A protein has these predicted regions:
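Mid-domain alpha/beta scaffold segments of enzyme catalytic cores
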Residues: 1-230
């Protein structure tokens, strides 16, 4: 699965992929209203299986490409407006949905309750899910998946959280190029995370849950196939 980040990279990403590759379309550009139609056009490509990651973010980033970046309520409301439009596109084109939520649980759950559609059941994931039982209960109720990334190897709260999640709800992610898992995080500080590191994440979770890596990987793979309708 190859995620895109900005629309400028979408077409080239589609062009370089082979028949075994599927693509996720994100929607993170601040001035994005004019891009909605472009995204809708890309959704007609069969290689595109998901919209994401998309969502609501209240985190104050130290570094950003936007010089005027501020977390103000007007900006949060704008994020909500465009998230709703993207959810509608996922429903309309029967695509999976990869949700980004950072420090915005109340906003996210309220919005999802207002627009939820049965078509999203089994086709939606909380990407890099925060260790929050409110998110877990919503995901369980609506047959969503919980995404687990490299930070599970050093984030103690997530380690305890993941022990409570049924295996049939878990999918493994790398969040490449971010969130290098340990021990790479310390040994290779400053280097990009890569998809191949999914193995490290799977092995760590298996040790955490006291099960075999093979059985856990098979379950997570089956979950991913269901999520992305592969």
């Amino acid at each position: 699965m190859i995620p895109g980040f900005f629309l400028s990279s979408k077409t080239s990403t589609i062009n370089i992929t082979n028949n075994q590759t599927k693509i996720e379309l994100p929607f993170k550009e601040k001035k994005a209203k004019k891009e909605l139609k472009k995204i809708e056009n890309l959704l007609t490509n069969p290689k595109v299986v998901a919209i994401g990651e998309v969502g609501i973010d209240r985190h104050i980033y130290q570094k950003t490409k936007y010089p005027d970046y501020k977390i103000e309520e007007e900006f949060v409301e704008l994020q909500k407006i465009f998230l709703i439009e993207q959810i509608k596109l996922a429903i309309k084109y029967n695509k999976s949905l990869i949700l980004h939520n950072r420090e915005a649980k109340k906003d996210m759950l309220g919005l999802l309750e207002s627009v939820w559609d049965k078509k999203l059941e089994g086709r939606t994931v909380f990407h890099c899910c925060e260790p929050d039982f409110g998110l877990f209960e919503f995901a369980k109720k609506h047959k969503m998946f919980i995404g687990v990334d490299g930070d599970i190897t050093y984030y103690k709260e997530k380690q305890e959280f993941i022990k409570t999640i049924p295996l049939e709800m878990l999918v493994f992610e790398t969040d490449s190029p971010f969130l290098n898992p340990e021990p790479l995080r310390k040994k290779e500080r400053g280097t990009n995370n890569e998809p191949k590191n999914i193995k490290i994440i799977a092995e760590y979770i298996a040790s955490l849950l006291h099960c075999s890596t093979d059985s856990l990987s098979k379950q997570a793979t089956e979950n991913a196939r269901k999520l992305f309708n592969l």
